Amino acid sequence: MKVQSSVKKRCEHCKIIKRKGRVYVICKVNPKHNQKQG
């Protein structure tokens, strides 16, 4: 999972999720796209 200051969807399968005040991008099809805002 990459930690980035600005997270964006990288494909149509990516989902933006907020958990505990953090923003995550979760992608089941391509796990390389997983990101966390930090």
From Swiss-Prot:
Belongs to the bacterial ribosomal protein bL36 family. Keywords: Ribonucleoprotein, Ribosomal protein. Coiled coil: none annotated. InterPro entries: Ribosomal_bL36 (IPR000473), Ribosomal_bL36_sp (IPR035977). GO terms for biological process: translation. GO terms for cellular component: cytoplasm; ribonucleoprotein complex; ribosome. This is Large ribosomal subunit protein bL36. NCBIfam families: rpmJ_bact (TIGR01022). The keyword Ribosomal protein applies. The keyword Heme does not apply. The gene is rpmJ. One of its GO terms (molecular function) is structural constituent of ribosome.
